[in-house]
Regions:
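Active-site microenvironment for binding and transforming phosphate-containing groups
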Residues: 1-238
Length: 238
């Protein structure tokens, strides 16, 4: 277990496997995570925020990046400003998803910049975003669910998808790749893919109805890697 902390809060990072998949960065008190394999592609910028380095208070301490949690708009905007300053992006160039656990993907351009942040979105039910336009910042949001980062260094395109258990069963990663193929001519063999921080199997208890969906969606040979049953009739899902 690894820890990062400021004067008020400690955050634990549980790493799976021997090699460090994620790097931890800090700039002026703002902490974020990144993948070294993607950092090596300097033409692409990415990051995954933590709770540290913002101005929000109490239960939202401190890097709250949601406008829907009861925080002031001023706090959220300042937090995004700090995160953008640390990582190196302009918050006004962000394009937000509208996550409802679908497998819907939206192709975005410079015309979409600011949607969800400084102006209204004209779309709903979008859990994945793709673009090939420089400067556009794809932005998705997470609690327990899995972020999927996709980079095409050949066609200079990127994708970012929110994969909860419903999206995983629905194979949103495949759908995102398919949309990149159709939109930009991407080839799966050229893509770099990274699975971001998410809830671990030890902490993710689900019921039988969820497992039944996974049994329907994945071949039996994968089941031992995906879940195991507990004495209480519940399952731990990976």
């Amino acid at each position: 277990m690894e820890y990062i902390q400021d004067q008020n809060q400690k955050i634990s990072i549980k790493r799976i496997g021997e090699d460090p998949v994620l790097d931890v960065h800090q700039k002026e008190g703002v902490y974020w995570l990144s993948f070294p394999q993607l950092d090596a592609r300097q033409e692409f910028l990415h990051g995954f925020s933590t709770r540290l380095g913002g101005v929000s208070k109490e239960h939202l301490y401190s890097m709250n990046l949601s406008f829907s949690r009861g925080d002031s708009e001023e706090n959220v905007r300042e937090n995004f400003r700090r995160m953008g300053e640390a990582i190196g992006f302009d918050p006004e160039k962000m394009v937000f998803s509208h996550q409802t656990h679908t497998t819907n993907i939206r192709k975005v351009t410079r015309e979409d910049c600011g949607k969800g942040f400084s102006r209204e979105r004209d779309y709903q039910d979008i859990d994945g975003l793709i673009t090939n336009e420089p400067g556009v910042v794809l932005t998705t949001f997470y609690a327990d669910c899995v972020p999927i980062f996709l980079v095409d260094p050949v066609k200079k395109a990127i994708g970012l998808s929110h994969s909860g258990w419903r999206g995983t069963v629905g194979k949103i990663s495949q759908e995102t790749i398919h949309c990149m193929q159709e939109s930009y001519g991407s080839r799966p063999e050229d893509l770099l893919a990274a699975v971001g921080p998410s809830i671990c199997q030890d902490c993710y208890e689900v019921s039988k109805d969820v497992i039944d969906r996974f049994k329907d969606g994945f071949a039996r040979k994968y089941w031992p890697e995906l879940f195991y049953e507990k004495p209480n009739g519940k399952y731990q899902l990976n």
